[in-house]
UniProtKB/Swiss-Prot annotation:
Organism: Schizosaccharomyces pombe (strain 972 / ATCC 24843) (Fission yeast)
Keywords: Cytoplasm, Nucleus, Protein transport, Transport
Any single GO BP term: protein export from nucleus
One function term, GO molecular function aspect: small GTPase binding
Main location (coarse class): cytoplasm
Superkingdom: Eukaryota
Described function: Export receptor for importin alpha. Mediates importin-alpha re-export from the nucleus to the cytoplasm after import substrates have been released into the nucleoplasm.
Subunit structure as annotated in this protein's UniProt entry: Binds with high affinity to importin-alpha only in the presence of RanGTP.
Signal peptide segment: none
Gene this chain is encoded by: kap109
The protein, known as: Importin-alpha re-exporter
Subcellular location, record wording: Cytoplasm; Nucleus envelope
Length: 967
């Protein structure tokens, strides 16, 4: 096997990278000190810098995959290796080049997430000891690493553990941090003024600003309150500081601009959280106002302007400070000097629209540039509306009307005035908004519907080429933004017009048309979709053809997948068409398989990929309802593509393919499993496949489906034992134990007792061991459901007798102790209606089985506890209300922006997978229980009624009689 540096060098060559990566994976599996070898390569002076960089990147990814691996994982970093890494990595980082410092600093921050401070108590002292009064490059590395560790506090919820960690840091870090802060401040006043030294100094100041925010983000520490004047005075000086030596390249956001933007974040935090002690608030308001009214429109200032406006917005939203701005003249100046200049189109905006339209869309819709001038200006207007709604609405409306008037005089030349008017109208009209729901509340002083009829609809109905594409894009955006305010007929009438814009040559226009298509199809009035499958049927084929034409016109897999909005529109059409999609089935299969084959070559856009597989899932969902013939058509088209993904080991796609395979297997009814699926069973049992966390949910579902459809295949090929081996691995994991129960449910319902007999004792031994030694609340609840499920079912190895005998095989008589001490007390905690139904039926089966109810039965002492538990399930409130999600609503809300695409599993909403009620025929549980108890009572010669009369309190007896039980 080649050595590691040779393999790393080969990863840099596209023709050899895949084989080199496979060989490195072998090293990972075989060499427990693999991580140390990578670090040694990074440390070796004679190694080529590109190989050292490759080693640092591979090391970073290796640590992220395996640092927190569970016991039993195929790759796990030993405690000894972990300690060596922590001992060496800081010194190695400090002596490395900048680009490698970044990678190692990220690793330190990642390890700190798990080990700091409890298992890495030397980290902070080591970092502090490296701080220098003169070496700014070392300080940059140290402070960058500290920021990587502390910044994770920012989004966290308050907790005792979090505050203990922060206190640990504050007690050790504050004094040296202040000393360095004072030193850099003095150096700035008295030190050298050459560009290189100044730049390094301000890089340190920038990191000091970021760390100041980190250390103050949860609460204001006493130390910083005591030294607030020192810090804030320095920040104020930095905010007004200028020096031509720091200008850098034209158009570049230099470090001084970044420092000022970071200070804006700090003063916004203090305004929002610690305003009562922030005595210099108005000093910062004044310098910020001056800044905003003097900065040029250059792009390099965009981030600073955005954060400066965010700070002013935070001040304005506090009523007592808003009064500072309440004079009409001040409000007028806000709109004219701050808002309007930052909403108006710049030449750079037009260039972005033409030259990088995808980035334009992302900035406009996703907030990828959340500090953009226009976005921040709009938020500022809405902040002013909170307190001065009438005045601001009046002032802005005047500017809207003036811009519309200018546009009307010469639409082809003054089109940018219409653009500004639309931006301003949205700014004052919207009071509440979410990406998923659109506008949820509006300013009642403006008429959204009238504005649509007078200013939007006429543009949309103009012939192609009349309205400028940037205005047309805003017109379309208006429709999907205010989709909940426009009435059903307006949306239905404009829908065909929106679809026509898919044929426009402008990337932004056809993308916004695709977004409108997607979002309009989910609109509900009175909880009912306004666009039914019948209503959209005439538009299905033309829209799909045009969308596929655009997607497939790309020259590379990366370009093909870049516009996820188009694929989301395809997905939405398939979902909403339901069975009406059947005439387009062949077309869809042809295009979806072709696209999957292409993007498999180089998966580059996780969101596009997710919508692609959701589209396939939606197609399977709709077509499988048409019978076995269409399922066969689906299998013939899709299985070869899925096979290719698995053979080529396209890691990103495997969880998706496994879900879709599960859906296909489940849809095939009682048809024999296709050979391809049969041949998949053994690979699915390979332990290596289960090491990837993202595969586990889909693998469990696929195994469940294959066991249900082909139990004899598992029996004849001796696959039952490997399946139980997987169950054992899952059940030992606190993260994945619930998947182990999902698999065990299916094993018990499908395989007969004679098949499972050799394993029953060990299965229950594993469960009881977890309950005794390492139980969690989730495990206990899931184990409770499993016990009741086994008791309630009558197939396979289920049934109350099998449950009791299986548990007692571990230790005689332990079933009764388990029920009274753990299982029965947990039943009332079950929240989902289906779990409670299964539990009630399981309790009923146990109550009426011979091992409990028969004279001199071993567990007759459980009769009253079991019966009491049934009554509590029926009559007492649920401790924590919870319901199964509405699957249709879930599909309406499919949004890849909210999903994670790394090791985690991304569920496909369209593949179903919803739990099925195993007892759909039982609708009135109380009556059913009474009937079964009456039958058992007769069979036992009235024994049950005798025990109830003697031992169950009178109110319990009355409740039972109300169900129909005869005592």
């Amino acid at each position: 096997m080649d050595d590691i540096p040779t393999l790393l060098a080969r990863t840099l060559n596209p023709t050899t990278s895949k084989s080199a990566e496979e060989a490195l994976k072998v090293w990972e599996l075989q060499d427990s000190s693999f991580a140390l070898k990578l670090l040694n390569i990074v440390a070796e002076d004679t190694v080529d810098i590109n190989i050292k960089l490759a080693a640092s990147l591979y090391f970073k990814n290796y640590i992220k995959k395996h640092w927190d691996s569970e016991e039993g994982a195929s790759i796990r970093i030993s405690d000894e290796v972990a300690e060596l890494i922590k001992r060496e990595i800081i010194n190695l980082m400090l002596k490395s080049t900048t680009i490698i410092q970044v990678q190692l600093g990220e690793v330190i921050g990642y390890i700190a997430n798990f080990d700091f401070p409890d298992r890495w108590d030397t980290l902070l002292p080591d970092l502090i000891s490296k701080l220098s009064a003169v070496d700014m490059n070392t300080n940059i590395a140290v402070l960058s690493t500290a920021h990587a560790i502390f910044k994770r506090w920012r989004p966290l919820f308050r907790s005792d553990a979090l505050f203990l960690e922060i206190k640990y840091v504050l007690d050790r870090f504050c004094e040296p941090f202040l000393a360095l802060f004072v030193q850099t401040n003095n150096l700035l006043r008295n030190g050298p003024q050459d560009a290189e030294s100044l730049n390094s100094l301000f890089q340190v100041i920038l990191l000091e600003c970021k760390l100041f925010y980190d250390l103050n983000c949860q609460d204001i520490p006493e130390f910083f309150e005591d030294h607030m004047s020192e810090f804030m005075t320095a920040f104020l000086n930095y905010f007004t500081y200028t020096n031509p030596s720091l200008e850098g390249d034209e158009g570049e956001t230099n470090v001084l601009i970044k420092v000022k933007a970071s200070i804006c974040e700090i003063v916004e935090l203090y305004t929002l959280r610690y305003e009562e002690v922030f005595t210099m608030l108005y000093d910062f308001v004044n310098v910020t106002w001056t800044l905003l009214t003097t900065l040029t429109p250059d792009e390099k200032y965009d981030g600073l302007v955005g954060k400066a406006m965010a700070f002013l917005t935070s001040v304005i939203r506090i009523r007592k400070h808003a009064e500072f701005f309440q004079q009409d003249q001040v409000l007028q100046q806000f709109i004219e000097l701050v808002v309007l200049p930052n909403i108006c189109l710049r030449e750079s905006d037009e260039e972005l629209f033409e030259d990088d339209p995808l980035e334009y869309v992302r900035r406009d819709l996703e907030g990828s540039n959340s500090d953009s001038r226009a976005r921040s200006a709009i938020v500022l207007v809405r902040g002013l509306l909170d307190h001065f709604d009438q005045k601001i609405t009046s002032v802005v409306s005047t500017h809207i009307n003036a811009n519309l008037q200018q546009f009307s005089t010469n639409p082809s030349l003054e089109w940018n005035k219409k653009y500004v008017a639309l931006q301003l109208f949205s700014a004052i009209a919207i009071k509440g908004q979410s990406t998923r729901l659109g506008v949820t509340s509006i300013n009642l002083m403006v008429d959204v519907v009238a504005f649509f009829e007078n200013n939007i609809k006429p543009d949309l109905l103009q012939p192609a080429g009349v309205i400028h594409p940037m205005v047309l894009a805003e017109d379309i955006k208006y429709v999907f933004t205010f989709r909940n305010q426009l009435n059903s007929q307006q949306l239905i009438d404009i829908f065909p017009t929106i679809l026509r814009f898919l044929e426009m040559p402008s990337f932004v226009v056809y993308t916004y048309a695709a977004i409108a298509l997607d979002q309009l199809l989910t609109v509900r009035h009175n909880h009912v979709h306004i666009f039914t499958s019948l209503l959209i049927a005439p538009h299905i084929l033309p829209a799909l053809n045009q969308l596929f034409l655009i997607v497939e016109s790309a020259s590379t897999p990366q370009k093909l997948a870049e516009n996820d909005y188009l694929m989301k529109a395809v997905m939405r059409i398939i979902i909403m068409s339901q069975e009406a999609i059947l005439p387009a089935a062949s077309l869809l299969l042809q295009h979806l398989t072709k696209i999957t084959e292409e993007v498999s070559k180089n998966p580059s856009n996780p969101k596009f990929n997710h919508y692609l597989f959701e589209s396939i899932g939606a197609l399977i969902r709709s077509l499988s309802k048409s019978g076995p013939q269409t399922v066969s058509q689906l299998e013939n088209a899709l299985l070869p593509v899925f096979q290719n993904v698995l053979i080529e080991d396209v890691t990103e796609f495997i969880p998706y393919v496994l879900q879709l395979l599960s859906q296909l297997v489940e849809a095939s009814g009682n048809e024999p499993l296709p050979d391809f699926v049969v041949n998949l069973i053994q690979p699915c049992l390979s332990p290596a496949l289960w090491d990837s966390k993202g595969n586990i949910p889909a693998l469990v579902r696929l195994l469940r489906a294959m066991i249900f459809r082909g139990p004899q295949i598992f029996i004849s090929n001796k696959f039952v034992e490997p399946v139980l081996g997987i169950f054992q691995k899952l059940i030992s994991s606190k993260v994945n134990d619930h998947f182990g129960f999902d698999l065990l449910d299916r094993v018990f319902t499908v395989f007969n007792a004679n098949i499972l007999a050799p394993y029953i004792n060990h299965i229950f031994f594993l469960l009881l061991s977890r309950l005794k030694n390492s139980r969690t609340e989730r495990f206990v609840l899931r184990c409770t459901i499993f016990f009741f499920f086994v008791a309630s079912e009558q197939t396979g190895t289920c049934g109350p007798d099998n449950l009791i005998q299986g548990v007692d095989a571990v230790q005689s008589g332990v079933f009764g102790q388990l029920m009274t001490s753990i299982i029965l007390p947990q039943a009332q905690k079950l929240a989902l209606p289906l779990d409670r139904k299964i539990s009630a039926l399981g309790l009923l089966r146990l109550l009426t089985c011979d091992l409990v109810l028969a004279p001199d039965a071993i567990y007759e002492n459980l009769i009253i506890p079991l019966l009491t538990c049934i009554l509590k399930l029926f009559e007492m409130p649920i401790e924590q209300a919870q319901t199964d999600a509405d699957e249709e609503l879930f599909m309406d809300e499919i949004d890849a922006d909210s999903m994670s695409f790394q090791a985690s599993f991304s569920r496909l909403a369209t593949t179903g997978g919803k739990r099925v009620d195993p007892f759909p025929q039982i609708t009135d549980l109380k009556q059913y229980c009474a009937t079964e108890m009456n039958l058992a009572n007769r069979n036992m010669g009235g024994r049950l009624s005798q025990i109830i009369s003697t031992h169950l309190p009178g109110d319990g007896q009355s409740v039972l009689q109300s169900y129909g039980y005869v005592i």
